[in-house]
Amino acid sequence: MITRRDFVGLALAAGGLLAARPVSAENPIAPPEMGDDGLYVQPWYIHTFLDFREDLIAARRHGKRFAVVWEQKGCSACKRLHLVNFRVPEVRDFVRDNFDLLQLNVHGSREVTDFDGTMLEERQLARRYQVLYTPTIQFFPDGLDEFKGRSGKDLEVARMPGFLLPPAFLTMFRFVREKAYERLRFQEYVDRTSV
């Protein structure tokens, strides 16, 4: 598993991979709204019954990957995720078109059903998954064969621990979408794609 230190280094290395197009009259993106829980939300985030097995199956039906973004009220990095990364059309479009992204609150009380059938409140699940930073994005496999009674923490194929600038952020989503994790470490992927 990649460490936060390694990830930050990779994020800086990937900085030149994306020439972000600014938001303009020709390229409008509505600003995000804030939900009742104090979290910014994207209109394309999925809203479900919070059963991860069902969410993954639905993502597959849509031809997408399933990922969870953990956030919290008052998190400045979470705010930047929405006001910086998701305001870049290339980033927003790639994530929206290729992932079913479910937003959870590290302090939330909604009941979530993990892949192994365990039902926990969001905050309990965040502890179970060892979510230490916000935003954190967990990426899960696209197949059901991997479940076999395992929790999401054991199933995740990649994790983005904290805020990354748009180039590195997009690179991680591409890494997962292409299933590059099956053959490369993230650093190797960055090295190969930045050439």
How should each PLM-predicted stretch be described?
Residues 48-64:
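A short beta-strand-turn-helix
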Residues 92-120:
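Thiol-based oxidoreductase modules, predominantly thioredoxin-like and allied folds used
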Residues 79-94:
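Typically the conserved alpha-helix immediately C-terminal to a functionally engaged Cys/Sec
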Residues 122-138:
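Structural micro-motif
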Residues 133, 141-181:
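Non-catalytic, surface beta->alpha helical segment in thiol-disulfide oxidoreductase systems
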Residues 62-75:
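Short active-site neighborhood of thiol/selenol oxidoreductases, capturing the structured segment around
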Residues 26-44:
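N-proximal helix/coil linker or "cap" segments that precede and/or mark the start of modular domains
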Residues 6-25:
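N-terminal export signals
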